[in-house]
Amino acid sequence: MNTVRVTFLLVFVLAVSLGQADKDENRMEMQEKTEQGKSYLDFAENLLLQKLEELEAKLLEEDSEESRNSRQRRCIGEGVPCDENDPRCCSGLVCLKPTLHGIWYKSYYCYKK
């Protein structure tokens, strides 16, 4: 009966001491995993931020460009007076101060580039 008690006590002491070591080891493993998890989260966060910035840039670019399907706004033809500050000359024309023949009008006109 004594040997059974001693054996049981010995097994109990070994189990407790090894279990304690496993507990410390598990704690260290968990700490390492949480640190790795944080680095993965930071990486994923940065990746998501980059994707969002790319999408935002594309959306802003699309807003600034005119659609190919949209009609051109009404424009001023060649030789027609235009406003220097708000030129509405048709494409291929530029709002310029007249040379020679239109000097006395003191106005700007649409001319070919």
UniProtKB/Swiss-Prot annotation:
Superkingdom of the source species: Eukaryota
GO function terms (MF aspect): sodium channel inhibitor activity; toxin activity
Cellular location(s): Secreted
Annotated region described as Disordered, given as residue ranges: 61-83
Proregion span(s): 22-74
One Pfam family this sequence matches: Toxin_22
Cystine connections: C75-C90, C82-C95, C89-C110
Keywords: Disulfide bond, Ion channel impairing toxin, Knottin, Secreted, Signal, Toxin
GO CC terms of this entry: extracellular region
Main subcellular location: secreted
InterPro entries assigned: Toxin_22 (IPR012627)
Range of residues in the leader sequence: 1-21
Family from the record: Belongs to the neurotoxin 14 (magi-1) family. 01 (HNTX-16) subfamily.
Domain note: The presence of a 'disulfide through disulfide knot' structurally defines this protein as a knottin.
Its biological purpose: Probable ion channel inhibitor.
Name of this protein: U11-theraphotoxin-Hhn1a
Organism: Cyriopagopus hainanus
